Amino acid sequence: MKKLGKYGKKVSCVVIGMLCAAAIGACGSTQSGSQDEKDVRNDISVYEEGADLEGTLTYGTLFIEPQTQHMIDLFMKEHPGVKIETKVVFDNDVTDEQYNEGLNTLLTELASDQRADIYDATYLPSEIKTKGSGYFEDLNQYIDADPNFNRDDYYDNILRAAEVDGKLYQIPEGFYYVMLRLNRNITDELNYEVPDEMDINDLYELYQQAKPIADDDFTIDVQNNIYVFLPMTEDRAYLKKEEVNFDSENYADFLRKMQELYQYQLSYATHAFTDIKSFSGKSVLLNTFTNLLEGSTSGMFEETDTATKPILLKSTDGKIPFWRIGEDFSMSSGCKDKALAWEFIKFCIGQKQFEFEDANSDSYYRNFFTYGSMLNKENTRQLVAYQLENDDDTAEKWEAYNEKVSAKAFRDLQLDSILTEIRNECMEQKITPEECAKLFQQRAELYVNE
């Protein structure tokens, strides 16, 4: 890589039509260099490739994940002139009360002049992340201004799905989506044509068809995962941007179907569970799993003697949701060195060349984080090639599935916990689906308008 002097030369790009800052006390850039190289008003400054970086950044988060600390250490090792200080609220497990107190501490910091330069926005309430609060920069501006950032190197559909009104306030480090396999002992007898994607309506219809031929202890999903994934998938479709429309016949219909399916659900782990690709008898309709490379990857996209091919779980609006994995990187509007902050975010999601045998001993982090962000296509291909031992056919299918994802699942921790409590009452038939939908509407409207 070429060197461009001690501080490096920045490339400046004028962003037309930027909104005036609603940001709280946003500061201009204070990078080293001449005046015309600084971030001035509507100019977005980025470093040229190979520049020597120097400066200090602060990284704020509730928890520091091992993979993030790993990236911080790698970045400082690669750029000795850079120091990244972490501002972490918790360093271990906490109670719900402590969590809420810590979150309030983080929100108070965000509204002050003591806020960090970069944040992991994963745990922040949705209105802080998405309602134009002015807390965070639109990272699309930096992507567009940086000649060294190529969207084709990333799953751009994920970046687009994470946008709010065309603005990218957070970049997810990685993502996963949900797939399911149906029990072929049931689908073969029904002569059921297995689709590529299914939503709640498809599953409900198949369940009704299967009941007459199924075993007496028939249940939809032995591990109850479907009752977690379906609401997460569907809620996203009814809470878009600042619009809330839970109070609709369509959502009440979704709840009615969920409620009916739930009544047939047996106790957790009633049936023996061994392999997502294997069914015994006709007591279970499906197994759910994520796209993560876990367990045996042999034949992961093929049908087996007792299980169908993987089927993507979608919402009723036809979109394939993704869930974030790892961090959601955000640049504070008060960041004091935005060009340097962008270099760090870009580094965290960029291509990495890792020695697989030197991976973290923890299999979870070894598989999904040690090799860099799965948002980067080449990182994913490296991992797939390693896990699948150059199984090109499976790797191509993996790529095709990743490219189909089009929607970010609604999952705000605070609101999600409120809605879950209400939904549980509906599932237990303490309230009707219509009452549940109305309560959802009231609580969600209050929440997004706070």
Which stretches of residues belong to each language-model region?
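C-terminal capping/gating helix-and-loop segments adjacent to ligand/active sites or protein-protein/ligand interfaces
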Residues: 323, 381-450
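Hinge/lid segment of periplasmic solute-binding proteins
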Residues: 38, 42, 121-177, 305-314
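C-terminal motif of bacterial Sec signal peptides marking the signal peptidase cleavage site
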Residues: 23-26
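Extracytoplasmic/periplasmic substrate-binding proteins
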Residues: 69, 253-343
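Helix-loop-helix "hinge/cap" segment bordering the ligand-binding cleft or interdomain interface
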Residues: 143-146, 158-227, 231, 237-269, ...
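Short, well-ordered beta-strand elements
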Residues: 40-65, 71, 82-89, 118
